């Protein structure tokens, strides 16, 4: 088993941040394994999985010296994948925006023991009405025995106009 450092990063966006992170990790013999980054409201945020030697303190301390970024890390042990006990499903939602819609979706998914592995949300202006439309793309991990039709019906009950689609 290998030690992995899970690093979260947030700070004002600027050119060259990913290069700076990658160079710092490589300089301390860390191996960049996986990552996900995004720019929201002028802020750069993301998470990186780094294979490290030992406890990874050198890598984390070096990263924390990068000016203007709030960097935190958690050390873990990379485990081999266990037998499949869940199914991966993609979900797409579109409906009129309103306060609490993400909470309502998350509550229903938790009720069925469905884990949100990835969530992307955004707003757009409705083509006909000009009203704000809520969009969500989710990657979920659901128990093999969960009734996805029942989950679908419960999600549709959130609002009359909410379109719910399982994606391929």
Per-region residue spans from a language model:
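A conserved regulatory-domain signal marking ACT and ACT-like small-molecule sensing domains
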Residues: 1-168
């Amino acid at each position: 088993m290998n030690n992995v450092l899970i690093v979260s990063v947030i700070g004002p966006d600027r050119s060259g941040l990913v290069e700076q992170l990658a160079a710092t990790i490589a300089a301390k013999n860390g191996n960049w394994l996986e990552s996900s980054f995004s720019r929201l409201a002028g802020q750069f945020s993301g998470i990186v999985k780094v294979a490290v030697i030992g406890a990874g303190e050198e890598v984390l301390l070096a990263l924390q010296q990068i000016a203007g970024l709030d960097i935190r890390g958690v050390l873990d042990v990379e485990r081999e994948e266990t037998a499949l006990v869940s199914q991966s499903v993609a979900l797409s939602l579109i409906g009129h925006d309103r306060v609490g819609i993400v909470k309502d979706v998350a509550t229903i998914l938790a009720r069925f023991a469905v884990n949100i592995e990835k969530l992307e949300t955004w707003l757009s202006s409705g083509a006909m009405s000009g009203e704000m439309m809520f969009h969500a793309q989710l990657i979920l991990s659901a128990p093999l025995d969960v009734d996805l039709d029942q989950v679908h019906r419960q999600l549709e009950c959130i609002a009359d106009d909410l379109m719910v689609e399982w994606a391929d």
